[in-house]
Regions:
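Terminal connector regions
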Residues: 100-147, 211-232
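Bacterial N-terminal signal peptides that target proteins for export
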Residues: 2-15
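Asparagine-centered strand-capping/turn motif at beta-strand->loop junctions
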Residues: 50-54, 167-173
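Beta-sheet-dominated interaction scaffolds and their linkers
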Residues: 28-51, 150-159
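Surface-exposed binding patches on compact interaction domains or structured appendages
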Residues: 31, 49-95
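N-terminal signal peptide c-region/cleavage motif recognized by signal peptidases
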Residues: 23-25
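Intrinsically disordered, low-complexity Pro/Gly/Ser/Thr-rich segments with frequent PxxP/GP/PP motifs
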Residues: 74-101, 187-211
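Short acidic/proline- and small/hydrophobic-mixed sequence motifs that coincide with surface turns
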Residues: 55-61, 105, 174-179
Length: 232
């Protein structure tokens, strides 16, 4: 049985396809309703849909929330934490805050982990079946009530400064800004992921003679924003 991890950034889909080509059948995972989760602070819970698109494979789904550094217990629970989902079925995960200390003047980022484990079909010969355990990590943003500004337009408020071979990005808003692309004179900065609220991030420049920065962000719904540009 093999484990495949997927996250918020781009994943190597060619590798997954290549694995499947070595077998006559490949048992894959479940479908999650969304690429990120927004938890409004004035809500008692949020729900995420889980669907099993397989025609004959039963899966066991395990879910939990964790902090990014994995050193502290996240103040959220997921119910049901473990359940069976039959082919063609859809179920809902309920995420509930259990307390804890989170910032009230800005967003906090956590992770929703969803692992799908396909059941072994005893009626099928196992020498031609690749069982894939798929673990997905979705960003979970806790958004306190009463934050100023519009999260949809937060990416427009970023400011950029060139310091030698480094690009500094400042975010004055209380919202995380997650990049879809960040380019300098048309050259993408592949390590650019996000800028924390009321914080900054630094990335290496592909060229020290850069003059124009262009970027797009990922919004609450997983969509891509319009491109913004600034002169350095």
């Amino acid at each position: 049985m093999r484990t495949i991890h997927s996250g918020d950034k781009k994943i190597n889909r060619y590798g997954v396809v290549a694995l499947a080509l070595f077998t006559s059948q490949a048992q894959a995972g479940i479908v999650i309703g969304g690429t990120r989760v927004i938890y409004p602070g004035n809500k008692t819970e949020v729900a995420v849909s889980i669907r099993n698109p397989q025609k004959s494979t039963v899966s066991l789904v395990q879910s939990w929330v964790e902090n990014g550094d994995k050193t502290h217990t996240a103040p959220f629970i997921v119910t049901p934490p473990l359940f069976r989902i039959n082919p063609g079925e859809e179920n809902m995960l309920r995420i509930v805050r259990t307390g804890g200390s989170l910032a009230e003047d800005r967003e906090s980022q956590l992770w929703l982990n969803v692992k799908s484990i396909p059941a072994i079909n005893d009626s099928q010969p196992q020498n031609n079946v690749l069982q894939l355990v798929v673990k997905s990590r979705l960003k979970l943003f806790y958004r306190p009530p009463g934050l100023e500004g519009d999260p949809i337009n937060a990416y427009r408020q970023l400011s950029f400064t060139r310091n030698g071979s480094q690009l500094s990005v400042s975010n004055p808003t209380p919202y995380f800004v997650t990049f879809f692309t960040l380019k300098i004179d048309g050259h993408e900065i592949p390590e650019a992921e996000n800028v924390p609220p009321k914080g900054s991030a630094t990335f290496s420049l592909p060229a020290v003679t850069a003059s124009t920065v262009t970027w797009q962000a990922i919004n609450d719904y997983g969509g891509i924003s319009q491109a913004e540009s600034r002169n350095l």
